[in-house]
Amino acid sequence: MRSYLCRLAVLASATAVLGCQGCSGTPTISQSHTDLSGVWLGPATTLEPSAPMTVRGQALFDAAKPLYGPRSVPVADSNDPVTRCDPQGFPRIILLRAPLSAMELVQTTDRVLQLFQYQGVYREIWTDGRSLPADVGGSSPQSPDPRWYGYSIGHWSNDGVFVAETVGAMETWGDEEGHPHGLGGRVEERYRLLDHDTLELVVNIDDPEMYQKPFLASKQVFKRGKELSEQLCVPSVAQQYLDLIAKPAAAPK
């Protein structure tokens, strides 16, 4: 309920800003910027092959027991954090398959808000000219803490593409197949409107702790939708499913 109310509060504040663009003294969104606002329904994401992994990256990947992909295992045998309703983390949240990939973009004067249907979470991509934080998770008292969804800034390129960069995301599964993501990783997202109802998202990853070189993680096409649905992971229900269905089904006969 709290996450749902928070999402409504964010939407309400963003709508207030957008609705008052003509008010005296209120800054307006530059007309040169492509307006990405709207609900976007994603595809059944196909992940691109990752770059060769480092020794540590390969060890983490080998230890992962995913629910999806060529190495998938039964739910009862999986160690995927989402079976416990943990947050998806980043960049996994932008690499989900449909219908989990549905999202809404709300464009304001100083940031782009990205609201996700699954688990009702949101992230802020700041466009006010700030820089990305340095030394996230470092030992200095001034070092910012890692976040599930990292720290993000964005800008518009000359060809109208919205480019977002993210650092400082917690070390989590990078996608549903168990590819690793390190704290020092850097993720670039490129959002391009192909037409009024079609949005392309290209995701590039540079994570030298886990991969030997940068690589293209995915290229997805979203279609415009009307509204998001409520899609929450409930820990008590997830545990009941494991205890009453998944584990008995996996037990030796």
Give the positions of each predicted feature:
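Bacterial N-terminal signal peptides that target proteins for export
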Residues: M1-A12
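Generic recognition of cysteine residues
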Residues: C6, C20-C23
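Hydrophobic h-region of N-terminal signal peptides that target proteins for export
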Residues: A12-Q21
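PEST-like low-complexity, intrinsically disordered acidic/proline/serine-rich tracts
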Residues: G22-K253
